[in-house]
């Protein structure tokens, strides 16, 4: 999956770090969580850049808001991944109808499926089907950290899957 995010994310972690210090827990678990979030974002970006270099393709981050079905980008994990792509010289294109980011590629691209409504809202008990915000051309490379997407006409990478087969 993707790292956590949202506008409350920094504030919540500051409060949790303060609590850990006040309770003298002896270890700042919350700092470690924040560090792991950064490292994972950079690793995903490096994966996208590797495929973009290898296939000479544009990087498209499918989902810009901090979670599906909202327009808010504060604390967006997608933007953090995009930042690390830019550090490597690749400016990603974002596609997310609720943030006003429209894109309809005609050529194969490297896609990051950053949103999964079915995973994000599973706890509600309401069926939230995953939907694509744009066409994914045949021959594209699709990086899916949720490990749900299937498309025989694309190279699909279920990112983070350590159980092959």
Segments (PLM) and residue ranges:
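Structural/interface elements that position substrates and couple domains in central-metabolism enzymes
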Residues: 1-165
């Amino acid at each position: 999956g993707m790292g956590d995010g949202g506008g409350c994310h920094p504030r919540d972690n500051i409060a949790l770090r303060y609590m850990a210090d006040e309770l003298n827990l002896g270890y700042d678990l919350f700092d470690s969580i924040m560090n792991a979030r950064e490292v994972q974002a950079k690793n995903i970006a490096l994966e996208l850049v590797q495929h973009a270099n290898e296939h000479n393709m544009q990087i498209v981050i499918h989902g810009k808001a901090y979670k599906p079905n909202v327009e808010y980008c504060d604390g967006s994990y997608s933007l953090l991944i995009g930042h690390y792509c830019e550090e490597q010289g690749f400016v990603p294109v974002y596609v997310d109808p609720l943030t006003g980011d429209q894109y309809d590629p005609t050529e194969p691209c490297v896609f990051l499926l950053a949103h999964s409504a079915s995973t994000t809202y599973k706890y509600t008990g309401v069926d939230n089907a995953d939907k694509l915000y744009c066409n994914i051309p045949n021959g594209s490379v699709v990086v899916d950290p949720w490990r749900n997407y299937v498309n025989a006409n694309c190279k699909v990478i279920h990112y983070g899957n350590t159980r092959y087969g």
